[in-house]
Regions:
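Sequence context surrounding c-type heme c attachment/ligation sites in exported
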Residues: 130-324, 365-407, 423-458
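Charged, low-complexity intrinsically disordered segments
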Residues: 111, 336-371, 375
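C-terminal catalytic/scaffold cores in eukaryotic proteins
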Residues: 325-332, 336, 357
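Alpha-helix capping/termination and helix-coil
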Residues: 321-329, 344-351
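Conserved small-residue
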Residues: 37-110, 117-123, 127, 139, ...
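Intrinsically disordered, low-complexity terminal tails and inter-domain linkers enriched
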Residues: 4-23, 27-33, 402-431
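Surface-exposed patches in mature extracellular/periplasmic domains of secreted proteins
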Residues: 97-105, 329-334, 427-438, 457
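Post-cleavage N-terminal segment of exported redox proteins
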Residues: 16, 21-38, 98-103, 115-157
Length: 458
């Protein structure tokens, strides 16, 4: 398949699309080469073997603890309609319905039910993900500190029936491969969906996170709240036109009734934050698996020196948590659905009125660029030595950013503590994009809100 490329046409449309014969949009390619994937080693775990035993371990995530209540009908669920049941299930799991994302490409387990007229809905919180396609089953992905992403499948609870929750093995075909960094993780597909089903092209394969160019995202998804920005692949059906890959527009709600869903949005901001979470989760899960495997090879002890490729991955992880490489938001910024913004901020941990969940939305996602994932039970449950290492590396990177800026102002030389941070050179690669004031604010927030952070909370 020939990828979209810059080409001319009779009439130029916004963001590089051109109108060809028959009204087909011929999509221009991204403005530059796709960003390279993280520098991960050619490593993948044997999930069945020691020390991982993915399917043999008992999960200790939040959803697994709720399964008995769900199975026995003790959760307060409204069974009057499919929509009402999904809404009440979201409330019971504390997942905001305003996080709804609609995907119409048949790139998931229940693909036979998914099409532009019956999109699958995805909902998410900081640690729990729920999927539902009308007429189908409920899918749940939850984050376990030892196992990574764990997947469950069950039929919609009916009046008087017992719910049977299945731990889904089939999900691992797509959730433990290149797209998830070879570990049990989360996947965000972006494809050019074909009019007869299937995909005509796939974008950003093997990549996840806030560094993926917007022009490679959202293929096969409905998107609302873009403010007119269309430099992405959302709201489009792929077409082949004279051997070239093009697209025709798809307006959300045109081929189906949004009344069938809890809300009428598939908000652009929710898509952006979901992308950040997926990239962070996959990197943290990979670090946990690699760390555990190295310790296992050393009889449970920490080695004197870690493999160089693992050190490189940990450095990249710390940079990711500090939003290194984040692509800029569209000109004019992003507004975000008010209901989603309110729901996103409801569990913010603030210090002096500032929080890691404070949104910027002018040129970047967050005002204080350190991932709020460090406040999740999933992060707290990582191997204690790994968590200690990540927090120490974060602190050194932030100290470097703060002191380097101070040194530039006063002529002072950054301290030894700062220059020994993760990354080489006079500025830490993980934090060189941060200004000194921002880095200092982030350190204050982390010290006050993250147990075990150097010099902070215990």
């Amino acid at each position: 398949m020939k990828r979209p490329s810059d080409r001319t046409g009779p009439r130029t449309l916004a963001h590089g699309a051109v109108l060809g014969l028959a009204g087909v949009l011929l999509m221009a390619g991204p403005p530059g080469p796709l960003r390279a994937a993280p520098a991960t080693a050619a490593w993948e775990p044997d999930l069945e073997a020691e020390p991982h035993r993915y399917f043999q371990r008992t999960p200790r995530d939040r959803f697994s603890r709720l399964i008995p209540d769900l199975a026995e009908g003790r959760l307060p669920l409204d069974r009057s309609s499919e929509r009402a049941l999904v809404r009440s299930l979201l409330r019971a799991l504390d997942i905001p319905e305003s996080s709804q994302l609609l995907v119409f490409s048949n790139t998931s387990l229940q693909l036979s039910l998914i099409h532009p007229g019956n999109p699958r809905a995805l909902y998410f919180s900081d640690e729990l993900y729920l999927g539902h396609v009308p007429g189908g089953k409920i899918e749940v992905a939850t984050l376990d500190p030892d196992l990574g992403a764990v997947f469950y499948l069950f039929d919609l609870p009916r009046e008087g029936s017992r719910v049977s929750v299945e731990r889904a093995r089939r999900c691992m075909n797509c959730h433990a491969n290149e797209d998830t960094m070879e570990v049990p993780g989360l996947s965000v597909k972006s494809v050019a969906p074909g009019p007869e089903g299937g995909s005509l092209d796939t974008f950003r394969a093997g990549l996840s996170g806030h560094a993926v160019p917007l022009s490679e995202r959202l293929g096969g998804w409905y998107v609302t709240g873009t403010g007119g920005f269309d430099g992405h692949w959302g709201n489009r059906m792929g077409r082949l036109f004279q051997g070239e890959l093009g697209a025709t527009p798809l307006e959300p709600g045109r081929r189906f009734s949004l009344d069938r869903y809890p809300v009428a949005t598939s908000d652009f901001l929710a898509h952006l934050l979901h992308e950040h979470q997926v990239g962070g989760v996959n990197r943290l899960v990979r670090a946990q698996y690699r760390w555990r495997e190295v310790r296992h090879r050393h009889g449970g002890s920490l080695p004197l020196a870690w493999p160089a490729d693992l050190e490189a991955e940990l450095a990249e992880l710390v940079g990711y948590l500090l939003f290194a490489g984040e692509v800029p938001l569209p000109a004019g910024g992003v507004a975000g659905d008010p209901a989603f913004r309110e729901a996103f901020a409801r569990n913010r941990r603030e210090v002096e009125g500032r929080s890691l969940k404070d949104l910027d939305l002018r040129t970047r996602l967050m005002r204080h660029r350190c991932s709020y994932l460090v406040h999740t039970p999933f992060f707290d449950g990582l191997d204690p030595a790994l968590r200690h290492r990540i927090l120490g590396d974060l602190d050194r990177a932030l100290a470097d950013a703060s002191e380097a800026t101070t040194g530039a102002t006063t002529g002072a030389t950054p301290s030894t503590h700062a220059t020994k941070a993760v990354g080489l050179g006079t500025r830490n690669a993980a934090s060189r994009h941060l200004g000194g004031d921002e880095a200092a604010t982030i350190r204050r927030i982390l010290k006050a809100t993250v147990p075990g952070y150097p010099g902070g909370a215990t």
